């Protein structure tokens, strides 16, 4: 009797595990680099942990975060476009922000994301309407790519390979994060935050991620060279934008707009060192990540950054 009950319990647990082990399905070829399924792709679907809960707003946001198959030619955006997108979200009363820390973190996510879609949301100087889901691109300087925290979108995974890679993107190279114990740490952090508050955040996701998109690989790119970031336009409502030159207490990492390129599907590096010499339309100035010549690889000591605090 005891053996039968034990076998029955094991059977139920196996069935429960199978039912909650989602698979991430990719129905397109989004990357210009070779890629293949990774371990997380067999155990965490597009909805993340929220796929099996009652938080519909969280599930919807997770699904957008994981949407690799944005369509159409990439529309070129500027930092000014990203700030205008943030202002437009405020005008429309789109909810965003969060309070507290896990496990008592409360997020104010939009229940209806259709208001964020391109139609009548924001028109670029070139006359293109863009919004959440649009395929876009921007040129800027990467600042210290690093793993994010454990997130609901990645089913709470804690391994670095299973986390998003967060990249601050700015129009001119921002100061590095000063090491702990630096006598001028407070001043240097303020200067760095002021620079980041004029930029945005862009992210690679772990699903089917090409090796050159890993944090360590991206940190090997010399920060002297601008990069071209291509991917989906996404409104990350889980945070707050900066308040002037200072990050909002709940806005880590610092950014001037909650609009991101997320997920990133292409990263290329410019052979020149100024934004004016790195037009996205000039294909002769761009190099794929895995084809970088030696002089475009960082030789300076790049300080390591820890993963960000867990969000969910």
Label every PLM stretch briefly.
Residues 5-15:
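Bacterial N-terminal signal peptides
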Residues 1-2:
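N-terminal secretory signal peptides that target proteins for export/translocation
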